[in-house]
Amino acid sequence: MAHHPRWTLSQVTELFNKPLLDLLFDAQQIHRQHFDPQQVQVSTLLSIKTGACPEDCKYCPQSSRYKTGLEAERLMEVEQVLDSARKAKNAGSTRFCMGAAWKNPHERDMPYLEQMVQGVKAMGLEACMTLGTLNESQAQRLANAGLDYYNHNLDTSPEFYGNIITTRSYQERLDTLDKVREAGIKVCSGGIVGLGETVKDRAGLLLQLANLPTPPESVPINMLVKVKGTPLADNEDVDAFDFIRTIAVARIMMPTSYVRLSAGREQMNEQTQAMCFMAGANSIFYGCKLLTTPNPEEDKDLQLFRKLGLNPQQTSVLAGDNEQQQRLEQALMTPDTDDYYNAAAV
């Protein structure tokens, strides 16, 4: 049965055209109705298979079609991945995301991927993966292994999409989201600002996401990281207020979703990041390089959290699993500890 669209393009365009301070006020009010405004979800992302991707996404240094100097690596060993997950947990992350540069996973790799998910879950962390398109069987196997979230971004509006990617259709992306949802895995899907798109395209992306039968539980909003060698390396910078506006509109349109401040934070100053949190962002990637692009150092993130009075969010895990989380929060809030300025060391 077809569901009734929650939003129209004219409604979304109206939001984008609102005076910024009015928009931020509305977004913050909606945010406070559904979330604790002082809590931020902290995730770590690990590239478990890097480079040599056959796709032609114009923004991506992992594509085999562009000379970016990135060295291709095989799928990591399961124990290597779990070691990284332990470190992420000890540094305060509550979700561990594993990304592979594939068009889709091979059947021969599925047992290893299942072991990775099971191992991460055994630590009391939420597990997330992004592996490209999935078929029904693969989605179900990952669900049975305990995968909490699957990330598959739409990237931009359907109208602009063909300017950025030609090796995978928009419908293929939507189909993968359907298969993930049907398998009982939560959906993580967002897009990128700065691809050369118009404001109408940003509205079109958020319209697609918010009008899914069930909106994504997690919506990463990325700012383009311009990598030398990719076709978008010389794109114009995104105005910070335009990015903040996109975060705010996402929060208003998807009030119960986590809105993640994702790639591109390295280029943002503290004031821009603070305004993103004010606009309704309540999730960040922390620590490890964001796949193959830089992410702010952990201690910088924790200093910013302290300045803004934000706390890393705890997840519901087995008793005893939140010990590191409590130590992290204590270090954040206690000026006379060695970890006050470098709580990531705990």
Swiss-Prot record:
Annotated residues for binding of [2Fe-2S] cluster: 97, 128, 188, 260
EC number per UniProt: 2.8.1.6
Quaternary organization: Homodimer.
Disulfide bonds: none
SUPFAM superfamilies noted in UniProt: Radical SAM enzymes (SSF102114)
Molecular functions (GO terms): 2 iron, 2 sulfur cluster binding; 4 iron, 4 sulfur cluster binding; biotin synthase activity; iron ion binding
SMART domains noted in UniProt: BATS, Elp3
Residue intervals of the Radical SAM core domain: 38-256
Protein name as catalogued: Biotin synthase
Cofactor(s) needed: [4Fe-4S] cluster; [2Fe-2S] cluster
Name of the coding gene: bioB
Family per record: Belongs to the radical SAM superfamily. Biotin synthase family.
